[in-house]
Amino acid sequence: AGCEASGLMAWESDPTENTRPFQIKLAARNGVTAALLAQDGFGGPAEIFDRAHSPLNAFSRNPTAERLTHQIGETWDGLMELAIKPYPCVAFLHPGLDALLELVDENDISADDVETLTIRFPKSGIHCIEDNPLKSHSAPYVLPVTLARRQLEIDDLFFDARNDDPKIAELCKKVEVVADEAELESLFPDFYATEIVVRLADGRTLSRRKDIARGY
């Protein structure tokens, strides 16, 4: 019930990962519901953002209501900041997933073929993906699952694939997360530039770099 409060970030400590997508969908549902109710004449406090018990006061010590209407109808920053994710995980991992899937498809790589799987990521953002208990934010989990299954689905985050698939569990042990302090770091945070390096059992080493998180 607590996680139904708009803007609450408690999902960061939810090991089930159910509440993160749940909250986003609630926001979308509530916006549509409010519009439909208003269309049918449903009433409410007209000064919802101006009174003492406004949502702005509930979530901020220094609310600035004027930002809600600043240049409204002239600029579309809110819309331009929306993202359409091709993968149900943190956006930091998206360029790496694009690179990994290209290598997997081009070389027909399976979990059994891999000796090591390395991701190079900007040092300033690596804390988010290196050893994160949330599966959706963990490179050592997301990359092996995506390689083994050639896709990443929301159920892969709700249910731990390591418990059901020994090959994925073993592959997770072969992941190395490396902090880049040079070129990739210089592009962060405007770009989530990532390099993926896959060392195969046949002696080949394959690499691919992607700089852009598609949909952002």
What are these regions (language model features)?
Residues 1-9:
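Long, well-ordered core segments of solenoidal/helical folds
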Residues 11-30, 36-216:
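Terminal-appendage/accessory-domain detector
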